[in-house]
Each structure stands twice: as structure tokens, then as C-alpha cells.
Amino acid sequence: MLKKLALSTLVLTSALFASNEVNVYSHRHYDTDKQLFKMFEEKTGIKVNVVKAKASALIKRIESEGKKSPADVLITVDAAGLYAAKSKDLLQSINSNYLTTNISENLRDKDNQWFALTKRSRVVVHKIGSDVQNQLKTYEDLADPKFKGQIMVRSSNNEYNQSLLAAVIAHHGEEYALTWAKGVVANMAKEPKGNDRYQVKAVANGIGSIAIANTYYIGKMVDNKDKSQRDAVSKMKILFPKFENGGTHINVSGAGVAKYSPNKENAIKFIEFLASKDAQKLFAVGNYEYPVLKGVESSKLVSSWGEFKDDTISINTLGENNKAAVKIFDKAGWK
Ligand code: FE
């Protein structure tokens, strides 16, 4: 009831003060965002209203709200979420010179229905001095029986894993992807549970030797109030695997404008702001993500992890192969 009330208030407010706010449906769950939204509010006087939930729930909500949806901007933490929103005809093309000039083609939808705001890489994290660094070079290696009982990775309902498997499909086809997923399952140290940081902590504490995690979580563990996270990550090192015929797996967090956005101008301003130099710097320094704007550097900590070459497949493929990836995870018994 309360939820319903809040929503109708939102609709009403957006109708009355159309030019003074932007309604953001966001799957991002990082503190930096609060700071960014505040910066935008101070700069433009446009109030940012945020609804936070998983992309799948936000997409369902926009669908059921239909033409009356108050959503202006959809932000996801994964390319497949944006792809799904576009496929369901929930987004619209964004007419912005700034965005098309500054965000490279591989990091946006071909009809400009969404733009990446940050890049993140899904990598291997191992103990400093561990033999893993000599034994593992590629994502394909993760399925090698020599790593039996060594891998800590979260569950298959997580979009970061789904996109990684989507990339495996893009490189090798579905048949190989199933063999690969079965191989990784056979190599798991434990049944999947917890988030990316949980996997890193487990390996730091001697459970398995390979944790699979997104890069920025390592930064967030270093820069953490919780001593147990700092202690765990101080023992660890990042290894950037690559695909046999490609580079290191890249995913994006990005934004699109909702099809029935009541504050379209504000929505575009908001996304342009998130792609501006100041905002990109904060994504880099505050959340340890890779900026998408040319000329903005990664944080010192992130740079210290080393360089890698982005995978060669198109980011859109992650969305195209998502359904197949989910099915394959199921068949492989990846919990
Ligand atoms: Fe995340």
C-alpha cells in the first residue's frame, strides 16, 4: 500500500514539476552513486529520485507501468540488462552529440538506446605467490581438471557470471560452453554462495585457490572500514585471464532513457552528466571502475593491478547470448 502511494506521488510530482526532476531506476548498488546524484542536483537544480532494485525487477516494473511509467532513466550493472530492456521496447534512442562523440561505438547500443558509463572486468583473484599465476592464463583454463576443488565463484543467477558465459558462447559456441561450464562446476571448491567479495575472502582464508570477481570489488575491499576485508585482500593479487582468441572479459554498467520518460530532457542531461569528466573521475576513484570517457584515467590503485587488452567480442553479444547462457548454466548444474 505504502509502495503504491509512493509511486502515485512520484507520478503526480513528475506531472507537476516536469522540468525539475529525473526518476532513475537503478540496479547500481555503490555509495559513489549517491555522491554523483548529489553533484548533478547541485549543478542543475534537477532533483534525482532513485528507485533501487535488480535490473530484472526494474524492467518488469517499467513494463507493468506501461505508458504511465514515471521512469526516466534505467541504469544497470550489466550489458545484458540494457539489451533486455531494449528488446522489450522499453527504451528510446538518445539524441546526444556529447554521448555519441565521446562514448566509443563498442560501448553503446547501435541505435543509441543505451550508453555504457563504466567498464568492469571479470578476473581471477589468487593469493600472492600462489602457483595459480603460472598455471592459469585463459578463461578456458578455468575448466581444466588440474584445478579440481580450487574455484570459488558465485551462483549462476548472477548477471556477471551469465555475461561471462555469454562471452564463452561468443568465442566457442554453445556446445563448448556447456563443456566449459561443467568443467568449472567440477572444479568448484564449494557450492556457489555469496557475492564476489565472499569468494575473494574464502580464497584468502584458504578455501580453494581461485576466486572469480569483478575488478572494482578488489578496490572496495582495499578501501573498506571492515578490517577483515582489508586483511583478506592484502593477501591477494589480480590475474587478468584472456580468451584463447581474444582479450580479458569486459562488462559495462550503463544507462538508457525509458520509452515513456516524462522528463526526457532531464534524463539525457543526467546521462550526459554521468559521462562527463567529473563524474567519470568519481566512478574511477570512488568505485574503482574503468571510465569510458577518453582522457579520464583509472585510479592509481586500479592502474597498479596492471594492463590488459579488452576482449574483442561486441558488448551487445553479452545480451544476445544471455538466454542461452542461463540454459547452459542449468544444464551444467551450476547452482
Ligand atoms: Fe557489482
Which residues does each predicted region cover?
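An extracytoplasmic/periplasmic, membrane-proximal ligand-sensing/linker region
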Residues: 177, 288-335
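Ligand-binding pocket segment of bilobal, Venus flytrap-like solute-binding proteins
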Residues: 167, 172-241
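Short beta-strand->loop
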Residues: 25-28, 92-100, 110, 113-115, 126-128, 140, 148-172, 227-249, ...
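Early extracytoplasmic/lumenal segment of secretory-pathway proteins
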Residues: 19-84, 335
